[in-house]
């Protein structure tokens, strides 16, 4: 949640987008609650990656730590001081990248039923959309496994758009993949993307 949500101005000039209340509850708080509801074990830690302290100050940090404590988890704060993409943001939380983990974009607002199979090596949650060319989409094989991940395809690949929630049985594998992306300086649009790390795991 290190970005500033410029597409939602003027609301986000004073409130970071993930903290904007929807039906009285901040987006990120509802997201954490939803994830806690589908995880089949206690959540030990919620790591928040936030931006510049000038925009994400002490009051916001306190609010985020309370969101974690409300579900019985330890809250950890990491900083991404410059917008360098989702892949880079995840690596800012490097000390927390081990064991099973859910990665979620803090401004994800999807009201849907979803479940988590802890036996799966990894899961990417998707949603059918009418304009797949505007999203990152996945292609599935006959068994429902992901075979391809394409960002804003120019030609039709599928209508299953990635919603920004991922599960990894061992997030250390994503960490290693993203580290190689950073080492190789694999940049798209001036940023390091999580998708480039995930593609190395498919």
Map each language-model feature to its residues.
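The conserved acidic donor/metal-binding loop of glycosyltransferases
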Residues: 106-109
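Conserved donor-nucleotide/metal-binding helix-loop-beta segment in metal-dependent transferases, i.e.
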Residues: 111-134
């Amino acid at each position: 949640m290190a970005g500033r949500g410029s597409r939602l101005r003027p609301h986000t000039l004073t409130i970071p987008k993930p903290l904007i209340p929807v039906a009285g509850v901040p987006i990120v708080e509802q997201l954490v609650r939803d994830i806690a509801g589908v995880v089949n074990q206690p959540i030990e830690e919620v790591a928040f990656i936030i931006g510049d302290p000038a925009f994400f100050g002490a009051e916001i940090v306190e609010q985020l730590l309370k969101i974690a404590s409300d579900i019985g988890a330890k809250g950890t704060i990491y900083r991404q001081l410059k917008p360098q993409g989702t892949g880079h943001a995840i690596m800012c939380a490097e000390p927390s990248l081990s064991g099973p983990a859910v990665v979620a974009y803090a401004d994800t607002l999807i009201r849907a039923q979803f479940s988590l199979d802890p036996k799966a090596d990894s899961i990417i949650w998707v949603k059918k959309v009418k304009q797949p060319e505007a999203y990152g989409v996945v292609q599935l094989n006959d068994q429902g496994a992901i075979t391809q991940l394409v960002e804003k395809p120019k030609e039709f690949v599928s209508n299953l758009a990635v919603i920004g929630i991922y599960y990894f049985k061992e997030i250390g594998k994503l960490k290693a993949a993203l580290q190689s992306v950073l080492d190789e300086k694999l940049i798209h649009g001036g940023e390091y993307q999580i998708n480039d790390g995930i593609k190395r795991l498919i």
